[in-house]
Amino acid sequence: MKKRVALAQTLIMDPEILLMDEPFSALDVQTRQLMENELLELWSADRKSVVFITHDLEEAIALSDRVVVLSAGPATHPIGEYTIDLPRPRDVAEIRLTPHFVELHREIWHRMKDEVMKGYVQSQAR
């Protein structure tokens, strides 16, 4: 409920660009999917720009029109950009079951996997 209130409070301000940094990370899977669908509905009403930061590749694909993959830190930079050409409106649970979603996931994960391992090694060295 707190996430819904926070999202509503942000949208009331009617920002030109909405920056969301891991907004649903603390939620269980079912609540997360409800919130993701709610975000898509709200977005479709006025189509403002949303910069959505997430470590969840499935979430990125399900919500986005474009995914930008960043390198492992500390000098993070873009290493790939992918157009997400899935039909709208979308249901985040249903879209994940489509062959094109799976294809996009496979393509992006193939590019990301080395960076994920670099990040893992960096975190273990600390």
Describe each region flagged by the PLM:
Residues 7:
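Hydrophobic anchor residue at the start of the ABC signature
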Residues 47-53:
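Conserved H-loop
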Residues 32-46:
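Helical segment within the ABC ATPase nucleotide-binding domain
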Residues 72-104:
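Conserved beta-strand-loop-alpha-helix hinge in the C-terminal portion
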Residues 18-21:
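Catalytic Walker B motif of ABC-type/P-loop ATPase nucleotide-binding domains
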Residues 62-69:
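Conserved catalytic segment of ABC-fold P-loop ATPases
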Residues 1-4:
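Conserved ABC ATPase nucleotide-binding domain "signature" region
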Residues 13:
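Conserved signature/switch motifs of ABC ATPase nucleotide-binding domains
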